[in-house]
């Protein structure tokens, strides 16, 4: 079920507070977050947010083209190790 246009985008409160605090000070710092479900909003542009992928925090620089997407879209959680090689000797 998709979100309707009349609903506001979800942003975690702790993340929003940190970004507003940095914007008022005019500082740039890496913000760590576990909230992958938060939507990127225009006040986040220019900040670097370290998004947790289940193992570590991956730093992502927010640009204007990312607005409207979720933070989790920019930190992949699975590492593809490649397909298994065809090992006929072990099958015998």
Swiss-Prot record:
It comes from Pisum sativum (Garden pea). It holds the Pfam family Ribosomal_S19. GO terms for cellular component: chloroplast; mitochondrial small ribosomal subunit. InterPro entries: Ribosomal_uS19 (IPR002222), Ribosomal_uS19_bac-type (IPR005732), Ribosomal_uS19_CS (IPR020934), Ribosomal_uS19_SF (IPR023575). GO terms for biological process: ribosomal small subunit assembly; translation. Belongs to the universal ribosomal protein uS19 family. Its main location: plastid. The keyword Plastid applies. The gene is rps19. One of its GO terms (molecular function) is rRNA binding. This is Small ribosomal subunit protein uS19c. It comes from the Eukaryota.
């Amino acid at each position: 079920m998709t979100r309707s246009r009349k609903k506001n985008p979800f942003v975690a409160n702790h993340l929003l507070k940190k970004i507003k605090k940095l914007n008022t000070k005019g500082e740039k710092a890496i913000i760590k977050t576990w909230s992958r479900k938060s939507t990127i909003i225009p006040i986040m542009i220019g900040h670097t947010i370290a998004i947790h992928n289940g193992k570590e925090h991956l730093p992502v620089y927010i640009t204007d083209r990312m607005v409207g997407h979720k933070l989790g879209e920019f930190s992949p959680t699975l590492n593809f190790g490649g397909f298994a090689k065809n090992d006929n000797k072990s099958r015998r």
